[in-house]
């Protein structure tokens, strides 16, 4: 999972990784092996809306 954080620049394909990085840092703090960065994924915007609410 950690590799996704380093590959974020390559995964930019219609979604704003920067926003996900910020939001996930609050959502998944301490819940993943490598901390906040592990869950920084380019998920669909529909899923992102669900995470916001």
From Swiss-Prot:
Residues spanning the signal sequence: 1-30
InterPro entries: IGIP
Cellular compartments annotated: Secreted
Keyword Kinase: no
Assigned GO CC terms: extracellular region
Highest taxon, organism lineage: Eukaryota
Principal subcellular localization: secreted
Keywords: Secreted, Signal
Keyword Signal among UniProt keywords: yes
Main function: Enhances IgA secretion from B-cells stimulated via CD40.
Protein's name according to its UniProt entry: IgA-inducing protein homolog
């Amino acid at each position: 999972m950690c590799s996704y954080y380093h590959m974020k620049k390559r995964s930019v394909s219609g979604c704003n990784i920067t926003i996900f990085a910020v939001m996930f840092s609050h959502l998944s703090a301490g819940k993943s092996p490598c901390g906040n960065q592990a869950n920084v994924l380019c998920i669909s915007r529909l899923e992102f809306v669900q995470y916001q609410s």
